[in-house]
Amino acid sequence: MNLEGKVALVTGASRGIGKAIAELLAERGAKVIGTATSESGAQAISDYLGDNGKGMALNVTNPESIEAVLKAITDEFGGVDILVNNAGITRDNLLMRMKEEEWSDIMETNLTSIFRLSKAVLRGMMKKRQGRIINVGSVVGTMGNAGQANYAAAKAGVIGFTKSMAREVASRGVTVNTVAPGFIETDMTKALNDEQRTATLAQVPAGRLGDPREIASAVAFLASPEAAYITGETLHVNGGMYMI
């Protein structure tokens, strides 16, 4: 699964799953541009990628920011071959208490940004008749979760978007897929107390949380030449928590 000569853009790459994805794609030979919301975050990405890529500051909810970053990538690296839409946020609340902005912020960051970025890189991929778009979803987008109606709706939307876009661009050599993580060992899960952690693990037949590297491995496979005949799919990586 060699990615030599490919340029990969990974959003939300400063930590957790995004960082693991950026690191693994770089290990496989890709030149990786990882994004963060701040200049300091972008510098941290540049530091860990070293000669294998660089970090850039990107506001995924701002069309002008997206345009500027993609122009910079094109000028320096010649365009994007692999897009990994990983950036996302949570604004958890019960639906009865959910504020308008808690809904709209999630939709803008977790769904609309995927539309904007995917559309922005698509023309270049279609001209080359080759490209990979990989969206990071969530098990919640399929099974739902109390207190996350906004997040679940956005992640379910990612799956529908993936399937529709895949149908449109498959004949041009561009694949579009989703990787849907379950409970993964990140800063968010490390903050769980013992009771919460026990309750979480009780839902996972594998009996453990996933490692960010395991999500990265799924992404790296879908980004590879070996996955050229896979498109419109959602690859669930959740330790058996939810089986489709």
UniProtKB/Swiss-Prot annotation:
Transmembrane segments: none annotated. Coiled coil: none annotated. Pathway: Lipid metabolism; fatty acid biosynthesis. Pfam families: adh_short_C2. It catalyses: a (3R)-hydroxyacyl-[ACP] + NADP(+) = a 3-oxoacyl-[ACP] + NADPH + H(+). SUPFAM superfamilies: NAD(P)-binding Rossmann-fold domains. GO terms for molecular function: 3-oxoacyl-[acyl-carrier-protein] reductase (NADPH) activity; NAD binding; NADP binding; oxidoreductase activity, acting on the CH-OH group of donors, NAD or NADP as acceptor. Substrate binds at residue 138. The keyword Zinc-finger does not apply. The keyword Lipid metabolism applies. The active site is at residue 151. InterPro entries: 3oxo_ACP_reduc, NAD(P)-bd_dom_sf, Sc_DH/Rdtase_CS, SDR, SDR_fam. GO terms for biological process: fatty acid elongation. Its EC number is 1.1.1.100. NADP(+) binds at residues 12-15, 37, 59-60, 86, 151-155, 184. Homotetramer. Catalyzes the NADPH-dependent reduction of beta-ketoacyl-ACP substrates to beta-hydroxyacyl-ACP products, the first reductive step in the elongation cycle of fatty acid biosynthesis. NCBIfam families: 3oxo_ACP_reduc, PRK05653.1-1, PRK07231.1, PRK12824.1, PRK12826.1-2. This is 3-oxoacyl-[acyl-carrier-protein] reductase FabG.
